[in-house]
Amino acid sequence: NVKGCWNLGSCGMGCPTNAKQSMLVTTIPTALDRGATLLVETRVEKLVLQQGRVAALQCVAVAPNGRPLGGSTRIVAKHVVVAGGAINSPALLLRSGAPDPHRLLGARTFLHPVALSSAVFDHEVAGWQGAPQTIYSDHFLDVHPIDGPIGYKLEAPPLHPLIFTTSIGGFGREAAASFAQFPNTHALLALLRDGFHAESPGGRVKLRKDGSPELDYPLTPFVMDGARRALLSMAELQFAAGAKQVMTGHELAPIFTSWAQAKARIATLPMQPLLTKVVSAHVMGGCGMAADPA
């Protein structure tokens, strides 16, 4: 999925040369060549539903930052495909009053919550070079039954200065010292497999008073137990690979210099939201289409 790569290391922030074969340079040009009309800076506010069908789309003009500009457009089409992602798709259907007999619209929205761990080595890692995220491990997905304690996938992500500096903890000189070691820094992610246990039900998309979406996602003790085990696994792996320092994604974690130190301290960290760094790049669900409510 790459063509003419310049190896600039900015894949995760968007390719500056369009070598990454995104929709911008593949399917959208093809659609335009075949007669499609692309409306930019236009947002669908509501589907007009009549007799169980979409009769029209009510749209508004928006600025690049999403701020409404006041103009409106009404679109009538034979077929309508809702493809706004796991946040905006259920929000649109909720605003439109779409049929929801089981009251599941917006529910079971999953994130693969991610715990983070970075490590510093004596040698240069250059985590921004080469194809991104080529190594992963499913080992910890299979340690327990799928409906048992939450499992997790380990991935070695690419590094970018902006993503790295906004993801690690610390302030002032401590943070500056960590930034200075960026060339020798390696990172691991643990993606928690949510949605297979009653204590990991996922989140729910709701509407604010202005009709915009919000996601309520509970980071339950069950989920955070998985995050703790993931932090331990990642620190152990990094020290076994020769790391001289490990920085765990937790506000109260010091910089660890040995596996024994990390093992003892991570086991006692309070696994609470905001203290524990949790991120997500996989937003899924929210628009279940099965006839069975289960």
Predicted feature residues:
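Glycine-rich loop(s) and the adjacent beta-strand/alpha-helix scaffold that form part
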Residues: 17, 33, 42, 46-47, ...
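FAD cofactor-binding and catalytic pocket of flavoenzymes
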Residues: 77, 102-238, 245, 264-266, ...
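Conserved redox-cofactor binding core of oxidoreductases
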Residues: 1-44, 54, 245, 249-269, ...
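Hydrophobic/aromatic beta-strand patches that form the interior of the parallel beta-sheet core
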Residues: 39, 81, 186-188
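Generic recognition of stable, solvent-exposed alpha-helical segments in well-folded globular domains
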Residues: 10, 22-26, 39, 75-76, ...
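Short, hydrophobic/aromatic-rich segments at coil-to-beta transitions
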Residues: 52-58
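Short beta-strand or tight-loop elements
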Residues: 40-42, 73, 285, 293-294
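Generic, well-ordered alpha-helical scaffold segments in large soluble proteins
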Residues: 30, 34, 83, 95-96, ...
